[in-house]
Structure formats: structure tokens, C-alpha cells
């Protein structure tokens, strides 16, 4: 089974438990914090991945981290389970999948809006409103400036890309001229 499939199973189960307990958002925050710690600290990741360290040593390290980060018992149990099963390295993917499932549950989408030039607040709000109206969901828009676009905007929602950039329009014109 792929690590992505494994991550989705753990994430989905945790979202269901969080939904029942009303702790979806706090679980998301805790997963993100611990996942960031694993990603940023190569030494910590190396300890958990190294078979030379026994499971008891790894448990002690995990207990200290859980206490220091003040993680909930549910997240603590998940981390211990992942550690026992040798799957702690999958945590960043679990965290990412959890965030996606939590957003789906709460009716949130997180599109990325890239523009060739900085956009004004009014323009951003207009785009956010249009996306909310067309999707029927709450929109958490991430705005980026990409000078290579020359002008226009590119919006990415999940796996879909809506490209209204000048760069793409110029590329299309070039293709037409070369073929014609």
C-alpha cells in the first residue's frame, strides 16, 4: 500500500474522531506543529528512522516531545501508534491529508491566486467573492506574485488550473502562428 493511501486512512479516521469530539481544528493545529518539527529537525527524524535506537528510547523521546508540545491524548496516541508501526515518517502526509479532509468537512477551499503584478485588496476580495459564489464554499485565498506571468492571473483550486495570464495567451498566439 502506498504511503499516500496509508496517510489518507489515518487522516480520515482522525477527522472522524475529531468531528465526534468537536476537536477537528485543534487536532489539525497539533498535527501541523508536530509535522513541522519532524520536517525541520533532521536529527529528530533520523532518531525515529534509525533502527539502532530501540523502540523504548524512541518512546521516551516521543513522550518528552508530546509533553513539551502539550499535545492532546488522541494525537499522542496516534504518534505512539505510528512509532510502534514504523510509520512516523508518514506523519507529514497524514497532516496534509487531515487538513484536506478537515477543510472538506467544514466547507472550505484553499485556492492559490498568482498574478503578474501585486493586486489591490479590492481586487482580491472581488476574486474571493466570485470563487465563493461559484463553489458555494468558504474561500481561504493564498495570493502570490509571479512576475513571469507578465500580467493577468492564474487560479489553482485543487487539481484545476484557471490560467488567464498574459504569458499563456502569448504562448497560444505563438503556437497558432507556428502552425498557421
UniProtKB/Swiss-Prot annotation:
InterPro entries: ATP_synth_OSCP/delta_N_sf, ATPase_OSCP/dsu. One of its GO terms (cellular component) is proton-transporting ATP synthase complex. It is a peripheral membrane protein. The keyword Cell inner membrane applies. GO terms for molecular function: proton-transporting ATP synthase activity, rotational mechanism. Keywords: ATP synthesis, Cell inner membrane, Cell membrane, CF(1), Hydrogen ion transport, Ion transport, Membrane, Transport. It is found in: Cell inner membrane. Belongs to the ATPase delta chain family. F-type ATPases have 2 components, F(1) - the catalytic core - and F(0) - the membrane proton channel. F(1) has five subunits: alpha(3), beta(3), gamma(1), delta(1), epsilon(1). F(0) has three main subunits: a(1), b(2) and c(10-14). The alpha and beta chains form an alternating ring which encloses part of the gamma chain. F(1) is attached to F(0) by a central stalk formed by the gamma and epsilon chains, while a peripheral stalk is formed by the delta and b chains. HAMAP family: ATP_synth_delta_bact. PANTHER family: ATP SYNTHASE DELTA CHAIN (PTHR11910). F(1)F(0) ATP synthase produces ATP from ADP in the presence of a proton or sodium gradient. F-type ATPases consist of two structural domains, F(1) containing the extramembraneous catalytic core and F(0) containing the membrane proton channel, linked together by a central stalk and a peripheral stalk. During catalysis, ATP synthesis in the catalytic domain of F(1) is coupled via a rotary mechanism of the central stalk subunits to proton translocation. This protein is part of the stalk that links CF(0) to CF(1). It either transmits conformational changes from CF(0) to CF(1) or is implicated in proton conduction. This is ATP synthase subunit delta. It comes from Geobacter sp. (strain M21). The lineage of its organism: Bacteria, Pseudomonadati, Thermodesulfobacteriota, Desulfuromonadia, Geobacterales.
Amino acid at each position: 500500500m502506498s504511503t499516500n493511501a496509508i496517510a489518507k486512512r489515518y487522516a480520515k479516521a482522525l477527522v472522524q474522531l475529531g468531528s465526534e469530539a468537536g476537536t477537528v481544528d485543534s487536532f489539525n493545529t497539533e498535527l501541523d506543529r508536530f509535522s513541522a518539527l519532524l520536517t525541520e529537525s533532521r536529527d529528530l527524524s533520523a532518531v525515529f528512522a534509525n533502527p539502532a535506537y530501540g523502540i523504548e528510547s524512541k518512546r521516551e523521546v516521543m513522550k518528552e516531545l508530546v509533553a513539551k508540545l502539550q499535545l492532546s491524548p488522541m494525537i499522542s496516541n496516534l504518534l505512539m501508534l505510528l512509532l510502534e508501526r514504523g510509520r512516523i515518517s508518514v506523519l507529514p502526509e497524514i497532516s496534509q491529508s487531515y487538513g484536506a479532509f478537515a477543510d472538506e468537512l467544514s466547507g472550505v477551499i484553499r485556492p492559490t491566486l498568482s498574478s503578474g503584478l501585486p493586486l489591490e485588496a479590492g481586487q482580491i476580495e472581488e476574486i474571493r467573492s466570485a470563487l465563493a459564489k461559484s463553489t458555494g464554499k468558504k474561500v481561504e485565498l493564498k495570493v502570490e506574485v509571479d512576475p513571469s506571468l507578465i500580467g493577468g492571473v492564474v487560479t489553482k483550486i485543487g487539481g484545476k488550473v484557471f490560467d488567464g495570464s498574459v504569458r499563456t495567451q502569448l504562448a497560444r498566439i505563438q503556437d497558432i502562428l507556428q502552425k498557421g
